[in-house]
């Protein structure tokens, strides 16, 4: 272990636990002066002290790693790329030092920029709507608040993991008696618990109204559409069980956020309740164990736990429990037009607000190979290498002639974790010449000579020779 100075991180940990330097020193069996020297980067962190900290406070060693800052660093870079507020270029090294030494300041900067973007968008809509009628203005003004983006960013900032809620769901799953390959038994167990413990009446509906389930708190009537399979029905029931048995935790998590509208807060509550349902259907320790044993085989795990491909892939991205972490995955759901309706990441992979998406990313290739699992060894401009697994999923197929919903699901991890998965078979992840060069999107991508480039990068000036043609248009 080389010399690692972790003063700001140790200070952050101490303040989070409301400890004085003397109390922390006593807990670790060190002198107060020794702890003071570590906090002020006079002494480096040694392996024995690191082990004492991880044992005493239950944090992973990665808490003190600069690699763990990569996502926050990417978010700060995103702020710096907004030319309306920052016309100058800031060196990456400067941003890296700020993120590592002052993480709370960096996070505050990112959150302030998010609020600024919301205000800017609303102001732009207000100006554009001056000639519209009141009826025309109202839906546009409501849409610009974008509550789904607020919720998405809220979950993203928490690395898609809620420890207390996950453990509560896991305990309930144990009481329900989870069994492999038997989602119908889980459905029956949840139904009995709702009926016996909460006086809920469950009924089936065949109406084609678009509603898949509905619970009336007044009548205690839960209606579930008949076309859902056992796993889907169990998931909806588990969601309502969350409101009834873990609402204190759900509300507490959501209260930790800052919401621009009541709709955003309500959407967040539903999102966190869905997280609870997934944690009941795929209990953490069992799911983590089976994932490790199977090499994170998404289709196998889906069959074992009786849920769909998307639910399984999303649950894999939540395996971030301290001292029992899975592979840190990035999860995305996109449509043919490139709209990213879901994005969560436990890695340094960052989704910029300005660059769009990269057409060389294999997530988009899956639409020409529906239902087939595709793999890609890809490299980002910063040199990080990723393994991406992508497949399409269809939602709610109904009758002939009706338009169904198709999405591409992408699950990616850094190449250093890839050998733990079945998807690395046949790949030479050491040969970087086989990696596909991708980026966050053309406007923020620094990659040169990319034939697929659609827009010039904001990182430099456009140099065009009227008498010369090149592979890249800019």
From Swiss-Prot:
Keyword terms of this UniProt record: DNA-binding, Repressor, Transcription, Transcription regulation
Entry annotated with the keyword DNA-binding: yes
Gene this chain is encoded by: ramB
Full protein name: HTH-type transcriptional regulator RamB
Gene inactivation effect: Cells lacking this gene show high-level specific activities of acetate kinase (Ack), phosphotransacetylase (Pta), isocitrate lyase (AceA) and malate synthase (AceB) irrespective of the substrate. The transcription level of the rpf2 gene is increased 20-fold in the ramB deletion mutant during growth on acetate as the sole carbon source.
Organism: Corynebacterium glutamicum (strain ATCC 13032 / DSM 20300 / JCM 1318 / BCRC 11384 / CCUG 27702 / LMG 3730 / NBRC 12168 / NCIMB 10025 / NRRL B-2784 / 534)
Domain (HTH cro/C1-type) ranges: 10-64
Miscellaneous comment as given in the Swiss-Prot or TrEMBL entry: C.glutamicum shows high-level specific activities of acetate kinase (Ack), phosphotransacetylase (Pta), isocitrate lyase (AceA) and malate synthase (AceB) when grown on acetate as sole carbon and energy sources. It shows low-level specific activities with all four enzymes when grown on glucose as sole carbon and energy sources.
Listed InterPro entries: Bact_TransReg_Diox (IPR050807), Cro/C1-type_HTH (IPR001387), HTH_RamB (IPR026281), IrrE_HExxH (IPR010359), Lambda_DNA-bd_dom_sf (IPR010982), ScfR_C (IPR018653)
One of the protein's GO biological processes: regulation of DNA-templated transcription
Pfam families cross-referenced by the UniProt entry: HTH_3 (PF01381), Peptidase_M78 (PF06114), ScfRs (PF09856)
């Amino acid at each position: 272990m080389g010399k690692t100075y972790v003063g700001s991180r140790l200070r952050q940990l101490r303040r989070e636990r409301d400890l004085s330097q003397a109390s922390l020193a006593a807990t670790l069996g060190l002198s107060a002066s020794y702890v003071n020297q570590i906090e002020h980067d006079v002494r480096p962190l040694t392996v024995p002290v690191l082990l004492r900290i991880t044992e005493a406070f239950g944090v992973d060693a990665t808490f003190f790693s600069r690699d763990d800052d990569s996502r926050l660093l990417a978010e700060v870079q995103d702020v710096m790329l907004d030319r309306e507020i920052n016309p100058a270029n800031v060196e990456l090294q400067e941003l890296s030092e700020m993120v590592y030494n002052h993480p709370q300041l960096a996070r505050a900067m990112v959150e302030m920029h998010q609020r600024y973007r919301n205000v800017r968008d609303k102001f732009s809509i207000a100006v554009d709507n001056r000639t519209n009628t009141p009826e025309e203005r109202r839906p546009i003004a409501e849409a610009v608040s974008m509550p789904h983006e607020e919720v998405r960013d809220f979950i993203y900032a928490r690395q898609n993991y809620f420890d207390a809620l996950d453990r509560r769901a896991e305990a309930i799953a144990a009481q329900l008696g989870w069994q492999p390959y038997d989602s119908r038994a889980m459905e029956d167990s949840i139904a009995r618990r709702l009926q016996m413990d909460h006086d809920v009446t469950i009924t089936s509906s065949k109406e084609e109204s678009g509603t898949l389930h509905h619970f009336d708190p007044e009548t205690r009537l839960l209606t579930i559409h008949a076309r859902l399979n056992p796993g889907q029905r169990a998931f909806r029931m588990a969601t309502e069980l969350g409101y009834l048995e873990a609402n204190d935790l759900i509300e507490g998590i959501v209260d930790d956020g800052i919401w621009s509208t009541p709709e955003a807060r309500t959407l967040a509550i539903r999102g966190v309740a869905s997280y609870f349902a997934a944690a009941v259907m795929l209990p953490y320790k069992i799911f983590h164990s089976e994932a490790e044993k199977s090499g994170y085989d998404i289709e196998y795990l889906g069959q074992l736990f009786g849920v769909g491909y998307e639910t399984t892939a999303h649950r894999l991205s939540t395996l971030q429990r301290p001292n029992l972490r899975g592979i840190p995955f990035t999860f995305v759901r996109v449509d043919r037009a490139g709209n990213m309706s879901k994005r969560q990441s436990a890695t340094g992979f960052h989704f910029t607000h300005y660059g769009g998406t990269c057409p060389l990313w294999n997530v988009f290739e899956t639409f020409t190979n529906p239902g087939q699992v595709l793999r890609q060894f890809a490299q980002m401009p910063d040199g990080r290498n990723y393994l991406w697994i992508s497949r399409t999923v269809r939602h709610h197929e109904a009758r002939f002639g009706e338009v169904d919903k198709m999405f591409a699901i992408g699950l990616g991890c850094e190449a250093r974790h890839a050998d733990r998965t079945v998807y690395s078979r046949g790949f030479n992840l050491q040969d970087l010449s086989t990696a596909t060069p991708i980026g966050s999107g053309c406007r923020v991508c620094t990659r040169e000579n990319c034939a697929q480039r659609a827009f010039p990068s904001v990182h430099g000036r456009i140099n065009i020779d009227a008498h010369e043609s090149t592979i890249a248009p800019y």
